[in-house]
Amino acid sequence: MSYEVQLTESYFPAQSDGAIRKVTLGEQLRETTKRYPEKIALVEIDIDGLTGRSWTYRELLSTSETLALALAGRFTPGERITVWSPNTPEWVIIEFACALAGIVIVTANPALQFRELRYVIEQSGSVALFLVDEYRGNPMREIGIEACDGLGAVREIIDLNDLEKIPNSADPARSLPTVDCNDPVMIQYTSGTTGFPKGAVLSHQSLLNNARFYADRLEVSADHVWANIMPMFHTSGCGMVTLGCVQTGCKMLIVKLFDPNVVCRIIEEHRVSTILGVPTMLVALLEALQKEPVDVSSLKDFSSGGAMVAPELIRNIQRVFSCRFSTLYGQTETSPVITQNFPDDSIDNVCHTIGQPLPQTEVSIRFLESNKVVGLDGVGEICVRAYCNMIGYHDNPEATKDAIDDNGWLHTGDLGTMDARGYVRITGRVKDMIIRGGENMFPTEIENILMEHPNIAEVAVVGIPDETWGEVIGCFFRTEDSKPISARILHDFCRDHLSPQKTPTIWCRVDEFPMTGSRKIQKFVIRDQFLDGVYDPLPME
């Protein structure tokens, strides 16, 4: 049930209904193992959707502790190692092993190429690279060796599939170091929707408590089955889902590759109850289910964030899957969830807001110029002050200072509003805001309208440089099942709901959007590609 508050300005004080627990990832795994030693904790789902190996909580803890002892003989607490792999059980095991040994994991998208991977390894100061041989045609071992060449800090390149061989070198007399809940446990590189990635340093406490508050709001319990389709290199996969499962004691299916047809079959076969996915994944699941119906009646909860979740998509999910839907909002720098809808929220709240803040989380909407709190329903930058805020950007004090002000407020770079109930709405990114003839336009408002059109599957609205207006509004869209649609139809649809100045003047159809590793549309890439002539505007017939 939502918090009953009556605000007078766009500031939501931290709610104390959930206590912040001072535990590490390793301590949490030990606690859960005491409660559910023989309960299945982890199940492998391979690239074809076949069920592979499984671990009870007792086996997961034992395997993680054994590996942690071996790692403690190779690395010292605080050292950083890069993990470059798709979703595999070994990813989960090394996450807990590193946490137990006080080693900081640096996560890397398995789709990275040479320069991108080298940047992550070098900027983070990683002393080792853990990888797999290849993934989806990407020769990862070959690229990894090349990326580490000449980096003096890197001492080892280790195959994740050979983790069981490492413990052979463990000293039986060695003990694990003392790890504090405020210590760094992970460095996550920002997804790069607006440019160069920065490494957000996250603590045990921030990741664990955030995942627990998220799972609690979803009302997840030990009898749930959670399909982890989110990438483990992202806070959603290794944080929200993995740590949410471990704290509730439920079963996690770790899905190696997101294939919507495979995921639908997994829901039926394993009686999956809970799924977190970004909007593009949800669209794909709907399309797959329409083409090949299966029994998805076990599904209780969908949650989604990471990008705009269109109202029509939410309605379709609830209609087709007959389940509850929770929209949420956050970013890597906040471990990651800031706000989330409640399961009993109205369809209007779920469709048009991103919910109320999680427990122990202060949120305010602030003027960009003065940094003062705006009035209710006024547009400003969403700012957060909480346990979940990152420690800072790794080896980048300037960027850290730009992100977190002297009063501890983390500036998200997102624009939004807050109503008297503390429900937040997103209106766009500060950097995405379009200034047309001196008037501010918010892409999300336009995108939400377009996503109500039955033929639109995905959409991105960006500012295009213009000599007369400074910027004009460009709309880039993908249609359902690649069905053709004219610019005139979409223009008229917008005019039925928006003022003339908010209606796009440039319309481009795309087959596939440039995406980050966490499946967010890269608007700056779209804008650059348009200016380079990659997209041809549709005529206004």
Give the positions of each predicted feature.
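Conserved AMP-binding A3 loop
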Residues: 53-58, 185-209
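Conserved AMP-binding/adenylation subdomain of ANL enzymes
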Residues: 208-225, 233-274, 284-289
